[in-house]
């Protein structure tokens, strides 16, 4: 085979055919390594994510007030601790009260929902539409307590894991501080392992992928959550804080905002059909204003990854590393796409 004289198209497909099996084999080996070193890798990834987010205010303090790096890091960590403490003291007690209220109202909401479904059945019978909303409602009602118990058990396990992982949390904090102070030299050493022609491009693409995704998703989630809390409170919707924080948290994940809006609307409709419609209308308007009005002007292009690849990367990330895999799946997919576009 005369490689230099091959047509460019054939050469490209031959290169893909030769490298694809090697990539799959290396990927399988990488999965085994990730599974074996799960705990230290989890500490490393979380510390890097926290340092990546806190690095922005640190660099800002170095640039404008011209603080030295250790003082900037100390100020950012202290400010973050104060903000978390204030949120814990002011928001969490009210949030816990609203969660307790929802749990106490579950039997009542179940009965109300059954009556609403009966009304829908009667209406559909008048129009001679073959439906059986009550049967569907009973199936959901029978399954709902099981899901609540499952979620409760998961929360208890999470609390046990949190109590037993204080050492891990300490390692995360220490590594975060070191990455804020000496992260530049650490990554310089990592990227020296790459070929000279790749170093700058890989580093730039990797930073841009994570930066675009996390800044974009965090901005949209914060704007959506705060705007929804304010809007629902203005219209005197019960559980406005719980609904707004839930939607804001879910909006950090792709497709989470719309899914959570539908979910809170269904929960509100168990109390009153008009309340559910009201919540759906308010949340939809706020979501459209944030995602189609404010977010594009503030963020522009975020990842550019096709929705199908987003779903696939989320499923793969969840399979490989659970919630942590979901958090890093989209920026990694964006990075891989950019690198393939550059080198293929």
Swiss-Prot record:
It is found in: Cell membrane. GO terms for cellular component: plasma membrane. InterPro entries: AI-2E-like. GO terms for biological process: transmembrane transport. Its main location: membrane. Keywords: Cell membrane, Membrane, Transmembrane, Transmembrane helix, Transport. Belongs to the autoinducer-2 exporter (AI-2E) (TC 2.A.86) family. This is Putative transport protein sll0060. It comes from Synechocystis sp. (strain ATCC 27184 / PCC 6803 / Kazusa).
